[in-house]
Swiss-Prot record:
GO molecular function, one term: structural constituent of ribosome
Binding partners and assembly: Part of the 30S ribosomal subunit. Forms a tight heterodimer with protein bS6.
Entry function: Binds as a heterodimer with protein bS6 to the central domain of the 16S rRNA, where it helps stabilize the platform of the 30S subunit.
PANTHER family from the UniProt entry: 30S RIBOSOMAL PROTEIN S18, SMALL RIBOSOMAL SUBUNIT PROTEIN BS18M
This protein's name: Small ribosomal subunit protein bS18
SUPFAM superfamilies, per database record: Ribosomal protein S18
The organism of origin for this protein: Renibacterium salmoninarum (strain ATCC 33209 / DSM 20767 / JCM 11484 / NBRC 15589 / NCIMB 2235)
């Protein structure tokens, strides 16, 4: 029997490198909105295609933007 061929996942393009963005700022709401879901949750790295370091910076920037009411907190709550 022939060995099954292993499929490799297609590498995702990094949206920050494609747009030539080096600085992630909490005041750049348009950029940060690309990394949060319609419910306001931070999207996972495997979904967005960013590096570990970039994901940390994005998460921190989103949290800072939420603190100063530029972005909503996740979920609408009950009722």
């Amino acid at each position: 029997m022939a060995k099954a061929e292993i499929r490799k996942p297609k590498p995702k393009s990094n949206p920050l490198k494609a747009a030539d963005i080096t600085v992630i700022d909490y005041k750049d709401v348009a950029l940060l909105r690309k990394f949060i879901s319609d419910r306001g949750k931070i999207r996972a790295r495997r979904v967005t295609g960013v590096t570990v370091q970039e994901q940390r910076k994005i998460a921190q920037a989103i949290k800072n933007a939420r603190e100063v009411a530029l972005l909503p907190y996740s979920g609408a709550g009950r009722g």
